[in-house]
Curated annotation (Swiss-Prot):
Alphabetized UniProt keyword annotations: ATP synthesis, ATP-binding, Cell membrane, CF(1), Hydrogen ion transport, Ion transport, Membrane, Nucleotide-binding, Translocase, Transport
Name under which the protein is recorded: ATP synthase subunit alpha
One cellular-component annotation, GO: proton-transporting ATP synthase complex
Organism field: Streptococcus pyogenes serotype M18 (strain MGAS8232)
Assigned EC number: 7.1.2.2
UniProt lineage: Bacteria, Bacillati, Bacillota, Bacilli, Lactobacillales
HAMAP family, sorted: ATP_synth_alpha_bact
Reaction equations catalysed: ATP + H2O + 4 H(+)(in) = ADP + phosphate + 5 H(+)(out)
Residues carrying the site annotation Required for activity: S362
């Protein structure tokens, strides 16, 4: 049999063309140190900052320190099974979290894994946890209001969609309650809410989830939790995971409210990681880039331009102060990044003024342009009236002889303080807020005893719901006050019908 050299040559060439190598080339390193959620590995010379690394037991870590001899890695999750000498390999990817509609109504950890026992989450999309914030030309001015349902906020420190409004105060002053009420008030407002619990007790998170479920708010809310018992890398990454989930909706043209409860604990977790990674400590032992930690997070909240869909992320970051000290390092950092702050005071909270908002220290730098016309008209002088009342109240403690004008200011001030009180988990629609504040600023409450103010308010809403619902409807649809004569007549009719008189 003759051997045809050309046939053999063609056969070999075909085999070479069809050859599929079935081996995988990855850069690997060896773990040289493990402990406290931190690992060090040698041999990963080409690792990128923030790259996802995989340990041989299936655990993942993130490259943080790229040094000449080794790489400092923070471990995302349980690190008890990792040992010195284990192999760690590069993945070539940065950390991503699952995003999309399937997450709504679920409780997940910062890696996007469900922790509520309701089964797997079928998501198709992923977003990196670290992405650049929208640029200057990709943004739009804040112009739409975000109604929190709390009179003290919507009237005095209004928040707009796309704003960052810091909520700051000591522990146990009602910070979480303000945020939960704001989430409850988004029902039917076409908003998606994300509640990021950082370093909270698991029992506390469970309570908040049950509150959201009871009021039907879990239908439009995602809860991201990194509890106090979890390793500090998860506490550090949780807010970034939350805002990555929010960005998916924002770039679809939707509006998102995200609550970070609270960033003080994230800063503490980051300080812990930085010290373990041997980074040089600065003021209060925080690393030098702790400002950047929060600025790159909060800058991702924005109202984006119409070209990008016109969506928004509104952020309510929390900072916990010690003994009301708002000049502490982390507090001043976040105040300078955000568009205003709501300061909750312990002495107001303990004296029964809840929400315990200090109108003097609280400010909204951009929310005023988003406030509806009706609210602007009725709440315009409210802050000044409240400030002058506080001043007069302190002054009149030293003497009892007061002229009629001063006495009238004090009486109005006491009623203002009462009106701004609100029961827990009972946010008010904006039209009801406008009517009661109109009644207050136009003197209709001046002859109502202070102790009866809250009962008067409830009765007024019920009366208007039955007899003057068209006035509520006018405010709701036009965003402006109805005819003042009609509003005056309605309130007078209610006062004649009721018996709230001093």
């Amino acid at each position: 049999m003759a051997i045809n050299a050309q046939e053999i040559s063609a056969l070999i060439k075909k085999q070479i063309e069809n050859f599929q190598p079935n081996f995988d080339v990855t850069e690997t390193g060896i773990v040289t140190y493990i402990g406290d959620g931190i690992a060090r590995a040698r041999g990963l010379d080409n690792a990128m900052s923030g790259e996802l690394l995989e340990f041989e037991n299936g655990a993942y870590g993130m490259a943080q320190n790229l040094e000449s001899n080794d790489v400092g890695i923070i471990i995302l999750g349980d690190f008890s099974a990792i040992r010195e000498g284990d192999v760690v390999k590069r993945t070539g990817k940065i950390m991503e979290v699952p995003v999309g509609e399937a997450l709504i109504g679920r409780v997940v950890n910062p890696l996007g894994q469900p922790v509520d026992g309701l089964g797997d989450i079928e998501t198709t999309g992923f977003r990196p946890v670290e992405t650049p914030a929208p640029g200057v030309m990709q943004r739009k001015s804040v112009s739409e209001p975000l109604q929190t349902g709390l009179k003290a906020i919507d009237a005095l420190v209004p928040i707009g969609r796309g704003q960052r409004e810091l909520i700051i105060g000591d522990r146990q002053t009602g910070k979480t309650s303000v945020a939960i009420d704001a989430i409850l008030n988004q029902k039917g407002q076409d908003m998606i809410c994300i509640y990021v619990a950082i370093g909270q007790k698991e029992s506390t998170v469970r309570t908040q989830v049950e509150t959201l479920r009871r009021y039907g708010a879990l239908d439009y809310t995602i809860v991201v939790t990194a509890s106090a018992s979890q390793p500090s890398p998860l506490l550090f990454i949780a807010p970034y995971a939350g805002v990555a989930m929010a960005e998916e909706f924002m770039y679809q043209g939707k509006h998102v409210l995200i609550v970070y409860d609270d960033l003080s604990k994230q800063a503490v977790a980051y300080r812990e990681l930085s010290l373990l990674l041997r980074r040089p400590p600065g003021r209060e032992a925080y690393p030098g880039d702790v400002f950047y930690l929060h600025s790159r997070l909060l800058e991702r909240s924005a109202k984006v331009s119409d070209d990008l869909g016109g969506g928004s992320i509104t952020a309510l970051p929390f900072i916990e102060t010690q003994a009301g000290d708002i000049s502490a390092y982390i507090a001043t950092n976040v105040i300078s990044i955000t568009d205003g702050q709501i300061f909750l005071q312990e002495n107001l909270f303990n004296s029964g003024i809840r929400p315990a908002i200090d109108a003097g220290s609280s400010v909204s730098r951009v929310g005023g342009s988003a406030q509806i016309k009706a609210m602007k008209k009725v709440a315009g002088t409210l802050r000044l009236d409240l400030a002058s009342y506080r001043e007069l109240e302190a002054f009149t403690q030293f003497g009892s002889d007061l002229d009629a004008a001063t006495q009238a200011k004090l009486n109005r001030g006491r009623r203002t303080v009462e009106i701004l009180k609100q029961p827990l988990h009972k946010p008010l629609p904006v039209e009801k807020q406008v009517v009661i504040l109109y009644a207050l600023t136009h003197g209709f409450l001046d002859d109502v005893p202070v102790d009866d103010i809250l009962a008067f308010e409830e009765a007024l809403y019920d009366y208007f719901d039955v007899h003057y619902n068209d006035l509520f409807e006018t405010i709701r649809t036009t965003k402006d006050l109805p005819e003042e004569a009609a509003l005056d007549a309605a309130i007078k009719a209610f006062k004649e019908y009721s018996n709230f008189k001093s």
